[in-house]
A protein has these predicted regions:
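Solvent-exposed, non-transmembrane regions of integral membrane proteins
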Residues: 1-179
Length: 179
Protein backbone atom coordinates (compact mmCIF):
# COMPACT_ATOMS: atom_id res chain seq x y z
CA UNK A 1 0.00 0.00 0.00
CA UNK A 2 2.85 2.38 0.82
CA UNK A 3 4.23 1.98 -2.74
CA UNK A 4 0.87 3.05 -4.18
CA UNK A 5 0.49 5.97 -1.77
CA UNK A 6 4.10 6.99 -2.39
CA UNK A 7 3.50 6.94 -6.15
CA UNK A 8 0.41 9.13 -5.78
CA UNK A 9 2.21 11.56 -3.44
CA UNK A 10 5.18 11.76 -5.83
CA UNK A 11 2.93 12.46 -8.83
CA UNK A 12 0.94 15.07 -6.87
CA UNK A 13 4.19 16.72 -5.77
CA UNK A 14 5.53 16.88 -9.33
CA UNK A 15 2.23 18.40 -10.45
CA UNK A 16 2.48 21.03 -7.71
CA UNK A 17 -0.76 20.04 -6.02
CA UNK A 18 -1.13 22.18 -2.90
CA UNK A 19 1.17 24.90 -4.23
CA UNK A 20 -0.36 25.99 -7.52
CA UNK A 21 -4.07 25.34 -6.93
CA UNK A 22 -6.16 22.77 -8.80
CA UNK A 23 -6.09 24.38 -12.27
CA UNK A 24 -2.36 25.11 -12.04
CA UNK A 25 -1.67 21.56 -10.86
CA UNK A 26 -3.66 20.13 -13.78
CA UNK A 27 -1.74 22.22 -16.31
CA UNK A 28 1.57 21.21 -14.69
CA UNK A 29 0.44 17.58 -14.70
CA UNK A 30 -0.32 17.81 -18.43
CA UNK A 31 3.15 19.25 -19.06
CA UNK A 32 5.09 16.54 -17.24
CA UNK A 33 7.26 14.19 -19.32
CA UNK A 34 5.77 10.83 -20.25
CA UNK A 35 8.42 9.04 -18.23
CA UNK A 36 6.88 10.47 -15.03
CA UNK A 37 3.60 8.72 -15.85
CA UNK A 38 5.44 5.53 -16.77
CA UNK A 39 7.23 5.59 -13.42
CA UNK A 40 3.94 6.24 -11.62
CA UNK A 41 2.12 3.41 -13.41
CA UNK A 42 4.98 0.96 -12.91
CA UNK A 43 5.28 1.60 -9.20
CA UNK A 44 1.52 1.73 -8.64
CA UNK A 45 1.28 -1.59 -10.52
CA UNK A 46 3.93 -3.14 -8.26
CA UNK A 47 1.88 -2.02 -5.26
CA UNK A 48 -1.35 -3.49 -6.66
CA UNK A 49 0.31 -6.79 -7.52
CA UNK A 50 1.93 -7.02 -4.10
CA UNK A 51 -1.35 -6.19 -2.36
CA UNK A 52 -3.16 -8.89 -4.36
CA UNK A 53 -0.50 -11.51 -3.57
CA UNK A 54 -0.48 -10.70 0.14
CA UNK A 55 -4.28 -10.71 0.51
CA UNK A 56 -4.66 -13.99 -1.42
CA UNK A 57 -1.86 -15.59 0.61
CA UNK A 58 -3.31 -14.55 3.96
CA UNK A 59 -7.08 -14.62 3.42
CA UNK A 60 -7.52 -17.11 0.57
CA UNK A 61 -9.20 -20.39 1.46
CA UNK A 62 -9.31 -23.88 0.01
CA UNK A 63 -12.01 -26.34 0.96
CA UNK A 64 -12.23 -29.98 -0.08
CA UNK A 65 -15.49 -31.80 0.62
CA UNK A 66 -17.81 -34.43 -0.71
CA UNK A 67 -21.12 -33.05 -1.99
CA UNK A 68 -24.36 -34.59 -3.17
CA UNK A 69 -26.87 -32.77 -5.39
CA UNK A 70 -28.80 -30.22 -3.35
CA UNK A 71 -26.11 -29.78 -0.70
CA UNK A 72 -24.77 -26.33 0.15
CA UNK A 73 -21.65 -24.93 1.78
CA UNK A 74 -20.65 -21.50 3.06
CA UNK A 75 -17.97 -19.52 1.25
CA UNK A 76 -16.77 -16.06 2.37
CA UNK A 77 -20.26 -14.81 3.18
CA UNK A 78 -21.79 -16.51 0.14
CA UNK A 79 -23.46 -19.88 -0.26
CA UNK A 80 -22.39 -22.40 -2.90
CA UNK A 81 -24.99 -25.03 -3.81
CA UNK A 82 -24.32 -28.17 -5.83
CA UNK A 83 -27.09 -28.64 -8.42
CA UNK A 84 -25.96 -31.99 -9.83
CA UNK A 85 -23.91 -33.83 -12.44
CA UNK A 86 -24.58 -34.15 -16.16
CA UNK A 87 -22.72 -36.56 -18.48
CA UNK A 88 -21.67 -35.00 -21.80
CA UNK A 89 -20.27 -36.71 -24.91
CA UNK A 90 -17.82 -34.69 -26.99
CA UNK A 91 -16.20 -35.55 -30.33
CA UNK A 92 -13.14 -37.14 -28.67
CA UNK A 93 -13.95 -37.09 -24.95
CA UNK A 94 -16.52 -37.93 -22.31
CA UNK A 95 -17.22 -35.35 -19.69
CA UNK A 96 -18.95 -35.14 -16.35
CA UNK A 97 -20.21 -31.58 -15.73
CA UNK A 98 -21.04 -30.31 -12.29
CA UNK A 99 -23.36 -27.32 -11.94
CA UNK A 100 -23.12 -25.02 -8.92
CA UNK A 101 -24.81 -21.76 -8.09
CA UNK A 102 -23.69 -18.96 -5.82
CA UNK A 103 -26.11 -16.96 -3.72
CA UNK A 104 -25.60 -13.92 -1.53
CA UNK A 105 -26.57 -13.54 2.13
CA UNK A 106 -30.19 -12.79 1.18
CA UNK A 107 -30.42 -16.09 -0.73
CA UNK A 108 -30.46 -14.43 -4.16
CA UNK A 109 -28.69 -16.55 -6.80
CA UNK A 110 -26.27 -14.44 -8.81
CA UNK A 111 -23.91 -16.85 -10.57
CA UNK A 112 -23.79 -20.34 -12.03
CA UNK A 113 -20.47 -22.16 -12.19
CA UNK A 114 -19.93 -25.17 -14.44
CA UNK A 115 -17.00 -27.40 -13.60
CA UNK A 116 -16.14 -30.54 -15.52
CA UNK A 117 -13.96 -33.59 -15.50
CA UNK A 118 -13.04 -34.81 -18.99
CA UNK A 119 -11.52 -38.05 -20.16
CA UNK A 120 -10.09 -38.08 -23.68
CA UNK A 121 -10.67 -41.35 -25.53
CA UNK A 122 -7.31 -41.40 -27.35
CA UNK A 123 -5.16 -41.45 -24.20
CA UNK A 124 -7.64 -42.04 -21.41
CA UNK A 125 -6.13 -39.02 -19.71
CA UNK A 126 -8.48 -37.12 -17.36
CA UNK A 127 -8.43 -33.33 -17.17
CA UNK A 128 -10.40 -30.92 -15.04
CA UNK A 129 -12.02 -27.67 -16.11
CA UNK A 130 -12.62 -25.36 -13.16
CA UNK A 131 -15.74 -23.27 -12.82
CA UNK A 132 -14.65 -19.67 -12.21
CA UNK A 133 -16.67 -16.67 -11.04
CA UNK A 134 -15.32 -13.17 -10.48
CA UNK A 135 -16.97 -11.21 -7.66
CA UNK A 136 -15.59 -7.68 -7.63
CA UNK A 137 -11.80 -8.09 -7.44
CA UNK A 138 -12.08 -11.62 -5.98
CA UNK A 139 -12.64 -15.01 -7.58
CA UNK A 140 -14.19 -18.38 -6.74
CA UNK A 141 -12.86 -21.56 -8.36
CA UNK A 142 -14.70 -24.88 -8.20
CA UNK A 143 -13.09 -28.11 -9.36
CA UNK A 144 -14.45 -31.66 -9.46
CA UNK A 145 -12.66 -34.68 -8.02
CA UNK A 146 -13.61 -38.33 -7.90
CA UNK A 147 -17.18 -39.56 -7.87
CA UNK A 148 -18.31 -41.56 -4.83
CA UNK A 149 -20.41 -44.74 -4.85
CA UNK A 150 -23.24 -42.91 -3.05
CA UNK A 151 -23.73 -40.33 -5.85
CA UNK A 152 -21.52 -37.74 -4.20
CA UNK A 153 -18.49 -36.12 -5.77
CA UNK A 154 -15.38 -34.63 -4.22
CA UNK A 155 -15.39 -30.87 -4.76
CA UNK A 156 -12.45 -28.53 -4.28
CA UNK A 157 -13.40 -24.88 -3.71
CA UNK A 158 -11.00 -21.94 -3.64
CA UNK A 159 -11.80 -18.38 -2.51
CA UNK A 160 -9.17 -15.91 -3.77
CA UNK A 161 -9.87 -12.41 -2.41
CA UNK A 162 -8.47 -9.53 -4.50
CA UNK A 163 -6.72 -11.95 -6.88
CA UNK A 164 -7.53 -9.79 -9.91
CA UNK A 165 -5.32 -7.04 -8.46
CA UNK A 166 -2.35 -9.26 -9.32
CA UNK A 167 -3.25 -9.09 -13.01
CA UNK A 168 -4.34 -5.45 -12.95
CA UNK A 169 -1.01 -4.51 -11.37
CA UNK A 170 0.87 -6.46 -14.04
CA UNK A 171 -1.06 -4.65 -16.79
CA UNK A 172 -0.23 -1.27 -15.22
CA UNK A 173 3.45 -2.24 -15.07
CA UNK A 174 3.41 -3.14 -18.77
CA UNK A 175 1.69 0.14 -19.67
CA UNK A 176 4.20 2.01 -17.51
CA UNK A 177 7.06 0.30 -19.35
CA UNK A 178 5.69 1.55 -22.69
CA UNK A 179 5.84 5.15 -21.47
Amino acid sequence: VWVMVGSLVDLAGKAGLGKAGPSGALSRLAGLPRSVFGTFLGHFGIGLTTLGIVVVSIFGTETVLSMKPGEKTGLAGYELAFDGLTPVEGPNFTELQGAFHLSDSSGQNFATLISSKRTYSARGMPTTEAGIETIGASQVYVSLGDKGPDGSIVVRIWWKPLVTLIWLGAVLMVIGAVF
